Amino acid sequence: MKKRPQFLRVAGKGRKVATPGMVVQILPDDTATETRVGFTVTKKVGNSVIRNRTRRRLREALRLVAREDGLPSGDFVLIGRDKTRERDFSLLKDDLRQALRKGLGVNFRESPRGPSGKGRDQAK
C-alpha cells in the first residue's frame, strides 16, 4: 500500500492492536486475492536514517512471520514506535504474531514450531 486513502481506510474500518514494539492495524478481507501491507514510521521516532531502519526491521519481521505462519488476505498497516529499532528482533516477531493473533482471532494460525525453533515433538 502506498496511497494515503488506503491507509486511512484501514485506520477507519480496521482493528488496531498495540504491542510494545509496534502498532498493527488490520482490515481482513476474505474476498480479496492478495495481502496488502503498508509501513508507517512518524518523525517522532527520529531522523530519516532511524525511520528507515525501523521500517526495514518491521518489513523483515513481517516477511519472516508470513513465511513461517502464513498471512491471510486483507490490508495490514504496521506502525513503528520508538522501541521498534531497539527491541530484540525475536521479541519484535513475537509482538507481531501476538498482534496478528489478537486482531485476526481464529483466522490466524499459530506456528507449529516451539520456542526452540524445532518441531513440537523435538522441543522437549
From Swiss-Prot:
Q: Does the keyword RNA-binding apply?
A: yes
Q: Which domain of life is it from?
A: Bacteria
Q: Where is this region: Disordered?
A: 103-124
Q: Which GO terms describe its cellular component?
A: ribonuclease P complex
Q: Which reaction does it catalyse?
A: Endonucleolytic cleavage of RNA, removing 5'-extranucleotides from tRNA precursor
Give the matching Pfam families. Ribonuclease_P
Q: Could you mention a single GO BP entry for this protein? A: tRNA 5'-leader removal
Enzyme Commission number(s) of this protein: 3.1.26.5
Q: Which InterPro entries match?
A: Ribosomal_Su5_D2-typ_SF, Ribsml_uS5_D2-typ_fold_subgr, RNase_P
Disulfide linkages recorded for this protein, renumbered to the chain, are: none
Task: Answer whether the UniProt record assigns the keyword Signal to this protein.
Answer: no
Q: Name one GO molecular function term.
A: 3'-tRNA processing endoribonuclease activity
Q: What UniProt keywords apply to this chain's record, in alphabetical order?
A: Endonuclease, Hydrolase, Nuclease, RNA-binding, tRNA processing
Q: What does this protein do?
A: RNaseP catalyzes the removal of the 5'-leader sequence from pre-tRNA to produce the mature 5'-terminus. It can also cleave other RNA substrates such as 4.5S RNA. The protein component plays an auxiliary but essential role in vivo by binding to the 5'-leader sequence and broadening the substrate specificity of the ribozyme.
Q: How does it assemble?
A: Consists of a catalytic RNA component (M1 or rnpB) and a protein subunit.
- Identify its protein family: Belongs to the RnpA family.
Q: What is the protein's given name?
A: Ribonuclease P protein component
**What is the protein's species of origin?**
Gluconobacter oxydans (strain 621H)
Task: Tell me what gene encodes this.
Answer: rnpA
